[in-house]
Regions:
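Short, Lys/Arg-rich flexible segments
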Residues: 1-163
């Protein structure tokens, strides 16, 4: 995943105990990790599609907003949402995207012209020429309360099925 990924350190003692229990109970925890990854991908895609998140994102530039086909901030063609994927191993789950532009949305930053004196792009009904554009951070690869519940539910379900 060349775009952006999230890593989460688990601090919740119940979840840590459940993972330790899981690893001692199961020799192969890959199915659990894959289920967690699949659940996280689904939640992130749904939040992107609905434009619903606990994160309050900065509003769009009004001129740009007027030209958007989709009312949700990080959705235009659906390519970003469709690119969210997971990788899982026996002791990890990685969720991310291979879209290079995802990083600027996740972390924010300033875009400057690389091979020209200025950036030149269409905005609204006209064109803009500027030295730089600052994109505010709009984190979409996040772990929210519903994700924490999902992770715990999956782990506990797998543990119950092993007993």
């Amino acid at each position: 995943m060349a775009g952006v990924t999230i890593e989460v350190k688990v601090d919740d003692e119940d979840v840590k105990r459940a993972f330790a229990n899981l690893q001692s109970t199961m020799k192969n925890t890959m199915p659990v990790m894959q289920a967690i990854g699949t659940g996280l991908v689904g939640n992130i895609q749904r939040r992107l599609g609905n434009g619903v998140s606990s994160n309050v994102w900065p509003p769009l530039n009004p001129a740009y907003k007027a030209t958007k086909r989709n009312k949700n901030i990080l959705v235009e063609s659906g390519a970003l949402r469709g690119s969210i994927s997971e990788q899982a191993g026996n002791d990890f789950v990685r969720v991310g995207t291979n879209k290079i532009y995802a990083a600027i949305h996740q972390f924010g930053g300033t875009i400057t012209a690389k091979n020209a004196p200025a950036l030149f792009f269409r905005l609204g009904s006209g064109f803009v020429r500027t030295k730089s554009v600052t994109i505010p951070a709009r984190p979409f690869l996040t772990i929210e309360d519903e994700d924490e519940r999902l992770i715990a539910d999956i782990i506990f379900r797998f543990l119950q099925n092993k007993q």
